[in-house]
């Protein structure tokens, strides 16, 4: 053994003695190189994310215009975690949580931990305490824009508080990121969008709360309404596009198209029908949809209704979609972190 190697081994032993086992290791020896994921609750979004869902122990940012479906997407993730026996928490900084709607999306409201903090500091401290407990699988903060610093709440209405929220978020994320990774908690931050003043060229839209969240996020999702869905003259929902703007665990810029139905959330039948048609698992001839020479219905809405009533057939088609994209259905679905996508 060379003197250099002996010196390195001694240094490694000293580091492990001082900071604990696992504080330093060779990358190839790391037991958890593979990224464990939890389904987003939407098959189309799982495919767009590239690894079959949200990566555990990471920060996710979901942003978009008002009423675009940001909270709906987050509630579906909570419902999926609960379905697998996990614990979920919701920090409702906007004080706008609708338990009836959440229940319709499959959320077990009797088991969901809910906090409606008075200040941004309080909300982030509660989030930190829950994450450090190691007993929470997913935590949603709704929203970053509503995490108002204490100084702003206690000040007068016209007072200027430049950069206060950005400093709050930067400090909180520095403390939270390590704890989130160790506890394997999925932390979803919902964010709004704002317009930059005086931007002549390029995109004038930005998200509040400074730049820290953009850097710390493993995945950033942009949620936007594409068009209205109608039954006759009635508007029953929106076709929504979810774009993966940033992704450290798979290639970014993939887009998931989902139907968000009023009072129901993401239509599983709609996304399965669209994806199966693209892959030719379901054949479309004129207005008719068919699977294995069995007609599902005339028109998209009738075919969606048929799949809703025939769940075994729906899940069989979903299985073939997952198989095509190499996505596992169980919560232990794994993907390898791509080093070329790291900041």
UniProtKB/Swiss-Prot annotation:
Q: What is its main location?
A: cytoplasm
Q: Does the keyword Transmembrane apply?
A: no
> Where does this protein hold ATP?
64-71
Where would you find this protein in the cell? Answer: Cytoplasm
The protein's matches in SUPFAM superfamilies, at most eight in alphabetical order, are given as:
P-loop containing nucleoside triphosphate hydrolases (SSF52540), RecA protein, C-terminal domain (SSF54752)
The molecular function GO annotations come to: ATP binding; ATP hydrolysis activity; ATP-dependent DNA damage sensor activity; damaged DNA binding; single-stranded DNA binding
Q: Which residues form the signal peptide?
A: none
GO BP term, example? SOS response
Known InterPro entries for this protein?
AAA+_ATPase, DNA_recomb/repair_RecA, DNA_recomb/repair_RecA_CS, P-loop_NTPase, RecA-like_C, RecA-like_N, RecA_ATP-bd, RecA_C_sf
Q: Does the keyword Magnesium apply?
A: no
- State the UniProt keywords alphabetically: ATP-binding, Cytoplasm, DNA damage, DNA recombination, DNA repair, DNA-binding, Nucleotide-binding, SOS response
| GO cellular component, as recorded | cytosol
Q: Which Pfam families match?
A: RecA, RecA_C
Similarity field = Belongs to the RecA family.
Q: What's this protein's function? A: Can catalyze the hydrolysis of ATP in the presence of single-stranded DNA, the ATP-dependent uptake of single-stranded DNA by duplex DNA, and the ATP-dependent hybridization of homologous single-stranded DNAs. It interacts with LexA causing its activation and leading to its autocatalytic cleavage.
Q: Which HAMAP family match?
A: RecA
**Which protein are we looking at?**
Protein RecA
Q: Which organism is it from?
A: Bacillus cereus (strain B4264)
């Amino acid at each position: 053994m060379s003197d250099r190697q002996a010196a390195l081994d001694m240094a490694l032993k000293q580091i492990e003695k001082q900071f604990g086992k696992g504080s330093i290791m060779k990358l190839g020896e790391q037991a958890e190189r593979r990224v464990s994921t939890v389904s987003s609750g939407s098959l189309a979004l799982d495919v767009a994310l590239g690894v079959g869902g949200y990566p555990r122990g990471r920060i996710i940012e979901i942003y978009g215009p008002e009423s675009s479906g940001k909270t709906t997407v987050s509630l579906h993730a909570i419902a999926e975690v609960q379905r697998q026996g996990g614990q979920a928490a919701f920090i409702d900084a906007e004080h706008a949580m609708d338990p009836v709607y959440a229940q319709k999306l499959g959320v077990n409201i009797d088991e969901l931990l809910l906090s409606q903090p008075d200040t941004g500091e309080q909300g982030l401290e509660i989030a930190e305490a829950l994450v450090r407990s190691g007993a929470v699988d997913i935590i949603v903060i709704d929203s970053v824009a509503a995490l108002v610093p204490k100084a702003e709440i206690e000040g007068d209405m016209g007072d200027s508080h430049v950069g206060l929220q950005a400093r709050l978020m930067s400090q909180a994320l520095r403390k939270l990121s390590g704890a989130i990774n160790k506890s394997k908690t999925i932390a979803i931050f919902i964010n709004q969008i704002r317009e930059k003043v005086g931007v002549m060229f390029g995109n004038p839209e930005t998200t509040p709360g400074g730049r820290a969240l953009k850097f710390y996020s493993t995945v950033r999702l942009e949620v936007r309404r594409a068009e209205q869905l109608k039954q006759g003259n009635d508007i029953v929902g929106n076709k929504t596009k979810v774009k993966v703007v940033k992704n450290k665990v798979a290639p970014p810029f993939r887009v998931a198209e989902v139907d968000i139905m009023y009072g129901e959330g993401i239509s599983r039948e709609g996304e399965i029908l669209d994806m199966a048609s693209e892959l030719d698992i379901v054949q479309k001839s004129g207005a008719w949809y068919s699977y294995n020479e069995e007609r599902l219905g005339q028109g998209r809405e009738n075919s969606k209704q048929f799949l809703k009533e025939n769940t075994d057939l729906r899940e069989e088609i979903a299985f073939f979609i997952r198989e095509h994209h190499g996505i596992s259905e169980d919560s232990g679905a794994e993907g390898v972190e791509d080093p070329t996508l790291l900041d």
